[in-house]
Structure formats: structure tokens, C-alpha cells
Amino acid sequence: MNTAGDLFWNNVTEILKDNNKSLKSVALYMRDGVNDKKTLALYDKLYRYKREAINPPNVLIDGVLNYLKKFDKNLMISDLYSDWSEYDAEN
């Protein structure tokens, strides 16, 4: 069964792969391009959420989605994710 976390991370991974980017690129974007220990910690946190296929906190989701908007102005992933979020809220 696909969970909201699976759906979110599968779509994030696909968009990053299509654009030759990685989670480290996302972490650098979220930290304004500063490559320091905090950026590495953020990358580790994102990677752990991805590996465990769980949803990160909303502030991290917003950062990831803002980064992905660079590649897809319509950002279909946010539509899919919001559908799952509504489903989770109802159940």
C-alpha cells in the first residue's frame, strides 16, 4: 500500500532524477547555498525521511516543494500530495 510518505518521496525522487539533482541540492537551496554543517544536517534529515518514507514536517515539505517549483511551474506533485493529505485527514 502506498502511503502519503511513499507518494511524496517517490515523486520528489522522480523530479530530482529527471533534472539531474539530488537531495543535497534541495538542502543547499533551503539553506541559501551555504554549504556548512547545518546544511549537511538538513540533508541527513531529508534523507532519513526519504529512506523511511515518512512525511517531513510542513516547513521541510514547503522547502522541498519550493525547490521543485524551479522545474515544474504547475508542480503536479503538490496536487498529488494535497490529495493524500486530505485523505489522511479524513481517515
Predicted regions and their residues:
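N-terminal positioning helix adjacent to the helix-turn-helix/winged-helix DNA-binding module
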Residues: 4, 8, 22, 42-45, ...
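DNA major-groove recognition helix of helix-turn-helix/homeodomain DNA-binding modules
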Residues: 57-78
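A short, basic/aromatic helix-end/turn motif that makes direct DNA contacts
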Residues: 29-32, 49, 67-70
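Short, charged recognition helix plus adjacent turn
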Residues: 1-4, 20, 73-91
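Recognition helix of helix-turn-helix/homeodomain-like DNA-binding domains
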Residues: 32-56
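Residues within the helices of the helix-turn-helix
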Residues: 13, 24-28, 44, 62, ...
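A short, Lys/Arg-rich alpha-helix, primarily the initiator
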Residues: 1-33
